[in-house]
């Protein structure tokens, strides 16, 4: 059975893991590829401390982003309803449809905070009325907003 060595990845490698991961690889792979090309470094107590500090900083940053998303979710629910004006034909049907871009513009106008339209899920809206759109603010935080379509 071949001996394996433990290395710390300095960049993400699809077959092994992401940056900062500790992985066990064959000695030849580490010696001939990972270490010379700077894709990994030998594990030492100093390297372990460095990786631990980096992971702590990343966790703090991720927690901060999640808290900002939760605060924005609360702000959206406080506002309650966003109004979008569209042109309407004689039979009350919209010219075109309400898109996620329209919803993003309405939210940005009301909150002064930009939201990526690709994170907004809007049902097919072809008539006037009230609808609900879902917004993904963070991988763990979603929000629902009410949309009022008027002429």
From Swiss-Prot:
PROSITE patterns: RIBOSOMAL_L9. One of its GO terms (molecular function) is structural constituent of ribosome. Signal peptide: none annotated. Pfam families: Ribosomal_L9_C (PF03948), Ribosomal_L9_N (PF01281). It comes from the Bacteria. GO terms for cellular component: ribonucleoprotein complex; ribosome. InterPro entries: Ribosomal_bL9 (IPR000244), Ribosomal_bL9/RNase_H1_N (IPR009027), Ribosomal_bL9_bac/chp (IPR020594), Ribosomal_bL9_C (IPR020069), Ribosomal_bL9_C_sf (IPR036791), Ribosomal_bL9_N (IPR020070), Ribosomal_bL9_N_sf (IPR036935). GO terms for biological process: translation. Keywords: Ribonucleoprotein, Ribosomal protein, RNA-binding, rRNA-binding. Belongs to the bacterial ribosomal protein bL9 family. Binds to the 23S rRNA. This is Large ribosomal subunit protein bL9. The gene is rplI.
